[in-house]
Amino acid sequence: MTIICIDGIIGAGKSTVTHRLKKNLYKCYEEPIDKWTLLPNLYNDMKKYATPFQFQVLFSQYDQYLSFKDCKETVVVERCPWTSKNIFTSLMIENNLFDLSAIDTYNNLYERLSYQVDHFIYIKVDSEMAFERIKKRDRFAEQNISFDYLKSLENKYATSLATLSPSTVTIIDGSNTIEEVEFDVKTAINNFLSH
């Protein structure tokens, strides 16, 4: 099985692209946000909810993995445990939002529950565009996302993706139309699978 991860900051267009790919017969798994009962609370009080929320995300991603682990086809996931640990949890630790006494437990669980991604497709948009998209779609759980938080995510992705082998990451311009982004993502998937 080959696992490809669609990634990007909040508001990049990951969910829209993943949903469109699913309609085109790709085996896709969107972020299991329906299991993230702590998400609405997170942006209201990050200090209180960051740690339990990141555990909740990790467990939900593992549950999702169990549903496709025996699949023989190529699987496309929206975000993955690597993102949870290296982007969101890492950023929360840097900002003193993650309970330091839980880091070892989180890392141990991550080692047991994470899975290997073969290729990342990063939909790149700047934080200004992402912020406008978030305001426009007006999701309840995202009402308190700050521009500064998006900017810090954008920077964190830039530094974290740079640690991966360049052959495992494709960067797509997410400022294009959704049709163009979808086309570019499909092209990236096909290029990766043909090598």
Curated annotation (Swiss-Prot):
> Where is ATP annotated to bind?
8-16
Q: Which residues cross the membrane?
A: none
Which Enzyme Commission numbers does its entry carry? 2.7.-.-
UniProt keyword Kinase present: yes
Binding residues for substrate: 31, 43, 54, 79, 142
Going by the record, the broad EC class of this enzyme is: transferase
Residues of the active site are 78 (proton acceptor)
Family matches, as InterPro entries: DCK/DGK (IPR002624), Deoxyribonucleoside_kinase (IPR050566), DNK_dom (IPR031314), P-loop_NTPase (IPR027417)
Per the record's keyword annotation, is Protein biosynthesis included, yes or no? no
Sorted UniProt keywords: ATP-binding, Kinase, Nucleotide-binding, Transferase
- Tell me, what is one Gene Ontology molecular-function annotation carried by this entry? ATP binding
Concerning Pfam families, the annotation shows: dNK
Q: Which PANTHER family match?
A: DEOXYADENOSINE KINASE (PTHR10513:SF35), DEOXYNUCLEOSIDE KINASE (PTHR10513)
To which protein family does this belong?
Belongs to the DCK/DGK family.
Q: What is this protein called?
A: Putative kinase protein 143R
